[in-house]
Amino acid sequence: MTIKSDRWISRMAAEKGMIEPFQPGQVRADENGEKLISYGVSSYGYDVRCADEFKVFTNIHSATVDPKAFDERSFVDVKGEYCIIPPNSFALARTVEYFRIPRNVLTICLGKSTYARCGIIVNVTPLEPEWEGHVTLEFSNTTTLPAKIYAHEGVAQMLFFESDEVCETSYMDRGGKYQGQRGVTLPRA
C-alpha cells in the first residue's frame, strides 16, 4: 500500500468527487483574519471539518450502553458553532465533507494534534473501499473539565492508502450498513 499525495487527492476530488466540498489548500483563518483550526488538503492527507450537528452523550435515563440495542435517548442533540462535551464523556458529530472512496483505496482517520494536546481524542474507523457518506466522528473528552469542539473547523486528518491489488469484495458489494450515511449516524446492529 502506498500513501497518496496532495496531487492525487486533489485529482481524485476533481475527477471522481472523492471529497465534496473540497478545499484545495490549507485554510488557517476565516474571511475576517480570525485564526481557525486548519482544514483542507495537506501534503499527504486531507484535514476534515466538523459540521454544526452534534449528539452529546448523557446518562439521564440510566441506560446501559449496548451497541446491539443502542438507546437513542442517551444523546442530547446540539446544533451550533461549537459543542461543549462534559468531562469524561463523548459526543458524535459528522464531517462537512462527503466522501466517495475508490475501490482500491483504504482511508485512515487520525485526530489533529491541536485537539489531542487538549485531551480530546477523535475516533473514526477506516473508510473502506467503495464506502461513501458523511463520516461520523466520535470525540472523547478524557479530561476532568468540559471540552469545546468547533464546527466548520479542522478536527481530523484523512490519510489515503492505495492498494497494489483491487479488493475482491468492497464495502458497497457487502451492502455495508453505513453506506451512503448522511448526518450523524448512531450505531446499527
UniProtKB/Swiss-Prot annotation:
Record has Hydrolase as a keyword: yes
EC number(s) stated in the UniProt entry for this protein: 3.5.4.13
Residues noted as binding dCTP in the record, renumbered to the chain: 112-117, 136-138, 157, 171, 181
Molecular function GO labels: dCTP deaminase activity; nucleotide binding
Pathways involved: Pyrimidine metabolism; dUMP biosynthesis; dUMP from dCTP (dUTP route): step 1/2
Gene3D superfamilies: 2.70.40.10
Matches recorded under Pfam families: DCD
GO terms, biological process: dUMP biosynthetic process; dUTP biosynthetic process; nucleobase-containing small molecule interconversion
Active site: 138 (proton donor/acceptor)
Domain of life: Bacteria
Keywords: Hydrolase, Nucleotide metabolism, Nucleotide-binding
Catalytic activity: dCTP + H2O + H(+) = dUTP + NH4(+)
Top EC class for this record: hydrolase
The protein's role, per its UniProt record: Catalyzes the deamination of dCTP to dUTP.
Subunit structure: Homotrimer.
PANTHER family to which the protein is assigned, alphabetical: DCTP DEAMINASE
Family per similarity comment: Belongs to the dCTP deaminase family.
Entry protein name: dCTP deaminase
Protein's organism: Alcanivorax borkumensis (strain ATCC 700651 / DSM 11573 / NCIMB 13689 / SK2)
Organismal lineage: Bacteria, Pseudomonadati, Pseudomonadota, Gammaproteobacteria, Oceanospirillales
